Amino acid sequence: ISLGRLGFLSQGIDNEIHSIIEAISNNEFYTEERLMLTSIDRIALNDSLSKMIALRHKVALNAGFENFRDYKFKSLCRFDYTKDDCFSFHSAIQKTIPPILSELNKVRKQKLQLSSLRPWDTEVDPDQLAPLKPFKNTDDFVAKTIECFTEIRPYYGQCLKKLSDNGYWDLESRVGKAPGGYNNPLYESNVPFIFMNAAGSLHDVETLVHEGGHAIHSIISADLPLVEFKDLPSEVAELASMSMELISMEHWHVFFPNENDLKRAKKSQLESVLSVLPWIAIVDKFQHWLYENPTHTADERENQWLRIVKEFESENGVDWSGLEQIRRCTWQKQLHIYEVPFYYIEYGFAQLGAIAMWKQYKEKPEVALDNYEAFMKLGYTKPIPEIYKAAGIEFSFSEEYV
């Protein structure tokens, strides 16, 4: 069984796999073996990052920069925003989103009839319902997604049909298949390729409409004369895909004809959109501190992480008692910190933009879609703020805008 399929099955309430997962996730495991393993990995991962920070700081000094953060902003070609804009984003998210998540957690706790909400309780369906099943098989998945996109605008359905007719996607999960999902532009044919691991879940719908947004972006910008114009920064590329996630949601009745299932799917999508914003802000704020203080110790690093996390999560209603040592190193699960430093906040900017696009679509659907196509046609021929302006939205990080 593939990991994607296992994850899908584990959301259910009456199957053997779920019982196995519960058995290996008991309190004794978490408080003894889990803590021991975490401690071993934690030291090794801390040592690795310490070495990376020292080398990266040396690279920055050799290049004439005060720290690696300033060097990296330059190398990432961040011409349209500064570190202060990032700080504004952190502050705006911290003041606006956690109170909403706190209210959602209160409802979750009540539905699950718990005396305290533990971290793992946030990953289960609060109504203890079986996982949603939006499609029967891959052919059904393809047909419904094309129908969904056609309802938004017929041209979008034609774009996906072009991929389907040419065999330009590999959607179904199978044993031995590489993990993940992506849209890969093919600049000669100008027909992109979509790869993912569908297992029959709501997450598969979210993934394909996301990658479908990228695919439409690739096709609409195909006539730009230079490949470099189509090489998009994430702030722009993800605006297309994340916007399509939310816009398409207005047509998810194709996948969920039952009204209760449809509401449940939309609620899940919106909760995930909101919950990712504080995490992005936490990770980015942490990285600024790491490279502004390159000689810090591992203990100082974990203390700082905990301080930042508590700024955003102190009142979210999740009980971490007995798990403090694990919480101090939860940053270690974010591979970006190791592999692609400072590459992450772009997704937060794009997510805010996508919410603005969805708001625009709810109010004036045709105007919003015209603006959607207008910004995609630009590729990367304009500065990011101008591209967002073409979309009819702002490239803003203020508390008021959020």
Model-derived features with residue positions:
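A well-structured
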Residues: 1-132, 144
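Active-site-adjacent "gating/activation" loops or surface patches in catalytic cores
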Residues: 18-26, 130, 134-209, 213-218, ...
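Glycine- and acidic
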Residues: 34-41, 82-87, 123-134, 154, ...
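Short, glycine/acidic-rich hinge or "gate" loops at secondary-structure transitions
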Residues: 62-71, 106-121, 158-164, 224-230, ...
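Post-HExxH zinc-binding segment in Zn-dependent metallohydrolases
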Residues: 95-96, 232-261, 269, 275, ...
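A glycine-rich phosphate-binding loop feature that marks nucleotide/adenosyl-phosphate handling sites
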Residues: 108-128, 162-172, 233-236, 265-270, ...
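C-terminal, non-catalytic "cap/extension" segments appended to globular domains
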Residues: 208, 216, 246, 254, ...
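Catalytic Zn2+-binding segment of zinc metalloproteases
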Residues: 213-227, 247
